[in-house]
Amino acid sequence: MYKIKYQIEAVFLIREIDVAEGKSSKGESFLKGTFVLTIAGFVVKVIGSLNWIFVSRILGGEGIGLYQMAFPIYFFAMTVSQAGVPVAISIITAERVALRDIYGAKRVFRISMMLMLFTGIFFSILTYLAADWLIDWQLIRDARAYKAVVVLAPTVFFVTLLASSRGYLQGWQRMTPTAVSQIVEQIFRVVTMIVLASVLMPWGLDYEAAGASLGAFAGAVTGLIVLIYFHIRLERDIARDYGTDLKPLSGADYESRCSIIRRIFKLALPVSAASIMLPVVSNLDLMIVPQRLEAAGYSISEATELFGYLNGMAVPLVNLATILTASMAMSIVPAISESRVLGDSTRVYNQTAASVRISNFVCFPAFVIVFMLATPISSLIYNAPGAGPAVMISAVSIILLGLHQVSTGILQGLGHPTIPMVNMLLAAAAKVFLNWHLTAIPWLGIMGAAWATAADMGVAALINLYFIYRFIGYRIEFLQLLKTICAAGIMAASVYAFYTWTMAWWQIAAISTFGAVFFGCGIYVTAMILLR
C-alpha cells in the first residue's frame, strides 16, 4: 500500500485521498470512475432528450400513449429482476479482489451470471404472459398496447445479463465499461426506435409503438456485446498479472456457492426495494398533489398545469444537476467495500469525506444557478415562466439529493444496503404527510409540494449521515461546509448582479442567463480558492 495524493487545491481544498496500490488489471480510482460515469450520464440524457423530439413527431400523442402504457410494465419487471444486482455483485467482487482472491472473484461472476440467466428467463416469460392478463383485466385500457408489451419481454432477459456484467466490472473498479456500454446502448436504442417507428408507420399505431419498444431490445443486446469486449480485456489483464493457474482461497476467507447466492440476494433485495419505491412515491404524488391543489382553490386544469411544472419540469432539472453525485454513488460502492474488507478504516473515512466534499462542491453552485435563475431557465428551456416558483423551491433538493445519493453509496459499500432503503421509506412517509398538508395551503400551492420533495431527500440524507457517523465516526466538517456556503453566497450575489445588469443593458434573456451561469461559476471557484 502507498498513498497517491490528488492535488485538487482549486476544487477540494487539498484533500489527500488514499488509494490502494494495485496491479494494472485493477481499475480506476473512484474519482476517475465518477468522472467517466458523469460524462456518460450526461451524453445519455442528451441523446434521450433528442430522441423524444423525433419519436414524438413520428408517433404523435396517441402512439406515445401506447408506448407509455407498455413501458411501465417493462420497467417494473426490469427493476424487480435486476435493480440491486450490480451493487451486490460489485461489493462481493471488490471484496474478493481486495483479498487477492482472483479465482473467487471470477467465481462470483460465474455464479451471478447463472443466477441472472434463470432470473432473466423467468421475468421475460412473466412479462410476455402479463401482456394478456393486463389487457384482459383492463389494467391496460387500450388493447393496441399488447404488441409493445410483448416485444419488450425478451429485453428483460438481456438487461439482467447486463446488470451482472456491469456489477462484476464495477467490482474491479472499472467504470469505463459501464460508461461506454450505456452510451452505445442508448445510441442503438434511439436509432432503432426512430427507424422502426418510421418503417412500421403504414402498419398502424400499434406496430409503430411496438417498433419503438424494440429499441430497448436493440440497446440491451449491443450494450451486452460491448461488455463482452471489456470482459475479454479484463481476462487478458488478469492472465498477465496473476497468471492462468488461479487457486481458490482456503479457510475462513473461502465462500461457498450458497453463501454467495445468499449474499447477492441479501445485498440486492434492499436496493431493488428502494428502486421500486421511487415509482410508487411518484404515483402517490400523482394521486395527492393535484387533489390537494384543488383543495387550495385551483381548478382541475390549473392543478394539472402546476403538477406538470413540478414533475415534468422542475424534477428533471434536479436530476440533471445531480448526474455527478449519482455517478459517484455508483463508483464509491466497490471502493469503500475494498477498503472495508482490508480493514483500512482510515481509507474508508477519507473516501467518505472526499465523496461528501465533492457532492457539496458540485451541488451548492448547481443549487444557486437553479434557485437564482429559476424563471429565466424555465422560460428558455420549457417556454413556461410559470414553472419558476416550483423550479426555484425544487433547487433545494439538489443539495439534499446529492447528499442522499452519496451517503447511500457509502452505506452500501459498508455492507448496509438495508439502512438506506428503510430511510427512504421513512422519508417517503414524511413526504406524503407534507404533500397532503403543505400543498393545500393557498399561498404555497405547488411550492408546498416542492418543499415536501426537498424534505423527502433531506430526511433520507440526514438519517443516512447519522448511520455513517455511527459506523465510521464521520461527520460533515463544519468549517469546510461554512466555506462552501460562503462561496455559494458570493456566487448568488454575483449571478443576481450579472443577470440584472445585462438584462437592463441588452435585454436578451439567453445571453443574460448563460452569461450569469458562467460568470457565477467562475466567481464560485475563485471564492473557494481564496477561502481555502
Q: What is the predicted role of each segment?
A:
Residues 2, 12-19, 196-200, 218-252, ...:
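C-terminal transmembrane helix end/exit motif
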Residues 29-90, 95, 124, 128, ...:
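Signature of the first transmembrane helix
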Residues 122-141, 365-383:
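Short membrane-interface helical motifs at transmembrane helix boundaries
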Residues 83-98, 319-344, 352, 356:
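Helix-loop junctions and terminal segments of transmembrane helices
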Residues 159-181, 396-426:
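Membrane-interface junctions at transmembrane-helix termini in multi-pass inner-membrane proteins
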Residues 140-164, 368, 383-407:
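Alpha-helical transmembrane segments of multi-pass membrane proteins
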Residues 176, 187-230, 418, 428-462, ...:
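Membrane-interface helix-loop junctions in multi-pass transport and translocation proteins
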Residues 1-47, 103, 107, 250-275, ...:
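N-terminal membrane topogenesis motif
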